[in-house]
Design a protein with these regions (language model features):
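Detector for small/aliphatic-rich hydrophobic stretches
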Residues: 1-116, 262
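Surface-exposed loop/turn and secondary-structure junction residues enriched for glycine/proline
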Residues: 70, 77-81, 85, 126, ...
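Solvent-exposed alpha-helices and their adjacent loops that cap or buttress functional pockets
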Residues: 82, 157, 189-191
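Hydrophobic/aromatic beta-strand patches that form the interior of the parallel beta-sheet core
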Residues: 88-90, 115-117, 139-141, 198, ...
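Conserved inter-motif catalytic segment of the P-loop NTP-binding fold
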Residues: 93, 102, 110-177, 181
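Catalytic-core regions built around general acid/base machinery
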Residues: 103-107, 181-192
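Phosphate-binding/switch region of NTP-binding enzymes
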Residues: 187-262
């Protein structure tokens, strides 16, 4: 009974007050970099920048980069070369394939990966390697229809290839023409992933979606020899005209002299 009474008494005893222990506050965050600039020497402050500004600067630099075609005259027409993240088209009956191979050679020599969607099945690996193409950095896709070619180009652009070339071959192009919406989707994919897209076709296909459009006129042969001596084909002369560009006034043209490789 005594034990039970003791337990009952303990239930009704006044409760002890809890002591509130103050919790120390964390130290204030360091001052923003912008607030520190006035306290630094001018020579040091001029060399500092914020992380956000650095990201914006790198993005601008990336957009301004180009991939050269290695034809100086053509690069000058395009303002330095093929713009990254943009679609450029070269159409016509001229020697378009020479520009295609030269551009792939330039990209692979810079250490970049290139995808070639070869609808016309025109690539000769041995000749391409002799022209400076690093075949280890080239993915060669050989579609059967034009729809497959456009789909393959979009997949390559979305998976990290810095240069994608879609060559439609000689007319007639195999398969039906794709709708304009497919070109719009392809252009947006390239812009989103920073991929440079070069479309080579016997006639204009991309419409208003391309950043620039070149037209290659039919080449004219150049011969060596005269009189009774046999004439030897020395090369071809081709005129390339800038038909459209969103930042450069179109209408200019240049002549290219392409030699015959023995």
């Amino acid at each position: 009974m005594v034990a039970q009474a003791h337990q009952l008494d303990s239930l009704f005893l006044p409760q002890r007050k809890l002591e509130i222990v103050p919790v120390p506050l964390p130290p204030p965050p360091p001052a923003a970099p912008g607030a520190l600039l006035p306290s630094l020497p001018p020579a040091v402050a001029a060399k500092l920048t914020s992380g956000a500004e650095l990201v914006r600067s790198l993005a601008r630099q990336r957009r301004e980069e180009v991939i050269p075609t290695t034809f100086a005259a053509v690069d000058e027409l395009l303002g330095g070369g093929l713009a990254r993240g943009k679609m450029t088209e070269i159409a016509g009956r001229g020697a378009r394939w020479s520009l295609v191979i030269a551009t792939i050679a330039a990209a692979t020599s810079m250490g970049e990966a290139a995808g070639l969607v070869d609808l016309g099945d025109a690539l000769d690996p041995q000749l391409a390697e002799e022209a400076g193409v690093d075949l280890r950095r080239v993915l060669w896709v050989r579609p059967k229809t034009f729809k497959e070619a456009v789909t393959a180009a979009e997949m390559l652009g979305a998976t990290g290839f810095q240069l994608v070339v879609l060559d439609a071959g000689l007319p007639p192009i195999r398969g039906r023409r794709v709708p304009d919406a497919a070109w719009v989707r392809l252009a947006r994919t390239c812009e989103a992933h920073g991929c440079t897209l070069l479309v080579s076709a016997p006639y204009a296909l991309t419409g208003t979606t391309s950043e620039a459009m070149l037209y290659a006129h039919a080449p004219r042969a150049r011969w060596l020899g005269g009189g009774k001596s046999p004439r030897v084909l020395a090369g071809v002369e081709m005129t390339v005209r800038l038909d459209k560009h969103r930042r450069i006034r179109p209408g200019q043209s240049v002549k290219l002299n392409l030699r015959v490789v023995p």
